[in-house]
Amino acid sequence: MAAPEAPVKYVGICKDSAAFKLMKSMGWEEGEGLGKDKQGIKGYVRVTNKQDTSGVGLDKPNPWAFDTTQFDNILKKLKVQAAPTKTSKNDDDSDKEDESEDDAVKSEPAKLKTVAKVTRPQGRYKRREKGKLVNSYSSKDLEGILVKRTEDPSPAVCDIADSMDIEIISEDQDASIKEQKIEEPSSNWWGFKSGFVSGGLLGAKSGKKKLKASERKMFSENDQENLYNMVQDKATAGKQGLGIKDRPKKIAGVRYEGKKTSFDNSDDDDDDDDDDDEEDEEEDEDESEADDDDKDSVIESSLPAKRKHDEIIEPKIKLKNLCKQIVKKDAGKGGFMKLKQLKSLIDEQAPSVLSEFSSRKDAIAYLKLKLERSGKFVVEGKKISLVSSKK
């Protein structure tokens, strides 16, 4: 036994529901109204599409592809005559006899009746594709469709070509041919209305045209490039206020003015400066003042520009001033001292000065070379002494 069809949702009344059975048990029958006097609604609540909230001028979509009822009605109205089918041989013989009798009776030839064939979508599409084929078109029709350009130039182009005298120079021609001036196109040229400038025909020798003072100069690509470069070069010229350039630079909210000084840490750079300045200083200095200055100038401390986190700042020691102080204090008779003795005293007082040398011989050679370059010391073989200030 086939199962009953399931009720469609939201359409009609579900008679198998508990509510319908409860109403039946209470004395209500289908088709009667609700209420005490049965004056209420008799049918079920029908669900409708609520459209009362749509605004004025709402365009409802027209799903024409899903509604084909009109097309079906048109097809039904069409008269379709089906071709006769052959049932048996006897029917065919009888038909032939009838036709022969009719032909004998009728003297005039009967007009053949055209039978309308059933329309099919394949036939419609075939006709469309057949209409797109170009094989059956004539040459004139093809020229009208494909718009082939004719070899004869248009009258507008002819006017421009006739009015312009352009010289096309090739390598085979003689070099003695004079250049002809390129005349401007006619005033009826369409390019003037759009702001174009004629550049000549292909192969013509380019040359600058002299514009008259009364004529208007056109804006070219070079002018655009020059204008861009001029604006970019002077882009920062107007960002500062009046008088700002003449005032000193502002650092941390204060106008800073001063001299820039640099500190040199190498001994070699100091040698050249000492040789020039020491000769002038020795003429004006006394011996008493020289002793005090030497003691103060042995150790000089200078703060570096930037210091690392774990870096220890050590005092800077000048080798020449230290040697001068040692020779004055510990020199023997005649004011002479040996280089070995001077080197050992330097290691005692400032061991870091000559610590770069691995051997003692290299350190003594460097010390001798350093003192020979200075004008304060006199080096005679392995002995050293100070230059006397008395002349």
Curated annotation (Swiss-Prot):
Coarse class of the protein's main subcellular location: nucleus
Record keyword Acyltransferase present: no
Protein name: G-patch domain-containing protein 1
Disruption phenotype: Reduced leaf cell number associated with pointed leaves shape. Defects in pre-rRNA processing characterized by an increased accumulation of rRNA intermediates containing 50-ETS, ITS1, or ITS2. Higher levels of 35S, 27SA, 27SB, P-A3, and 18SA3 rRNAs. The double mutant gdp1 oli2 exhibit strong growth defect due to a synergistically impaired cell proliferation in leaves and enlarged cells.
Domain G-patch: 15-61
Pfam families: G-patch (PF01585)
Intracellular or extracellular location(s): Nucleus; Nucleus, Nucleolus
Keywords from the UniProt entry: Nucleus, Ribosome biogenesis, rRNA processing
Motif (Nuclear localization signal): 305-312
GO CC annotations, alphabetized: nucleolus
Disordered as annotated region, ranges: 80-132, 212-307
Gene name of the encoded protein: GDP1
Function text: Involved in ribosome biogenesis, required for normal progression of rRNA processing. Seems to promote cell proliferation in leaves.
Record GO terms (molecular function): nucleic acid binding
Segments of skewed composition (Acidic residues): 92-102, 265-295
Any one Gene Ontology BP term: regulation of cell population proliferation
Tissue: Strongly expressed in tissues with high cell proliferation activity that have a high demand for ribosome production such as shoot tips, leaves primordia, root tips and floral buds.
